[in-house]
Amino acid sequence: MRIGFHTDAFNSAYFSFEKCLQWAQRNGVRYIECGLIDGVSWAHGLGYYPHVALFEDPVLLRRKMENYGVCFSQVDAAYPLSGKDGPIRGVPYVIRAIQWSALVGCPRVDTTDGLHAPAGLSDQQALDLMKYSYEQILEVAEAHKITVNIEPHGYFTTKPDYMARMLDFSQSPYLRMNMDTGNTYIAGQDPVAFLKRFVGRTSHVHVKDVSESLAAATRGQQTGIAVSHCALGEGVNAENIKACLRG
């Protein structure tokens, strides 16, 4: 097991990505995950956003990260692929993320669906659309030997039967799952049972606890947690996390 962190943890602290690298070096954390920006953002440009833009040269960034003793475990390219704009916005974004990842030395790219059922599409239509999208994505992923993970975070992916269908879009070894203990819990699922069903397809895990107040207010009504403000072990999901880690 290798422990890292997602730079989302520093969204509210307004860290830059380099400040996250400094934190990782100081605390002896070698692995890091961040989001990818496909374009420019004032917050990122001013150093108030702890993620990376695709215009940043991946080889130069890899060298900078090596100087800090840090490398990527995964990058987050989770534009929802379940809506009508999934093929036209999400697919090109994920493909660029894969190509960039190959140069920066990152082995995995995270993807997901939307939080809600997509407007104007039946569930079957949305699944068909996502299958077509993932087929295009995986062609590029296989060429670059980059794993594409599907994260439980939305309407489809937090339902185990739909996740199973999505993981069966392809038999490629480069299509896997990114487990998330917080998202599955807040969606009303049992994280332990969820992971047990897909443990053979899991290549990366987001470990998130859930506060008692958030669980009481929204469990079974949301499909994901944007940022967890509950430290591990301090919430109602702690025992589930322990069980997941024990396997």
Residue positions per predicted region:
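Mobile, glycine- and charge-enriched loop segments
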Residues: 1-10, 14, 71
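Acidic/histidine-rich catalytic cores of soluble enzymes
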Residues: 2-5, 17, 32, 125, ...
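A short, Lys/Arg-enriched amphipathic alpha-helix followed by its capping loop at the start of a domain
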Residues: 3, 23-29
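The substrate-binding groove and active-site-proximal loops of carbohydrate-active enzymes
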Residues: 9, 47-52, 78-88, 230-235
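Active-site-proximal loop/turn and secondary-structure-junction residues that shape catalytic pockets
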Residues: 9-11, 36-38, 78-81, 113-117, ...
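Active-site acidic/histidine proton-transfer and metal-coordination neighborhood
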Residues: 19-25, 58-74, 80-177, 197
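Glycine-rich, proline-tolerant flexible connector loops at the mouths of alpha/beta enzymes
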Residues: 33-62, 113-121
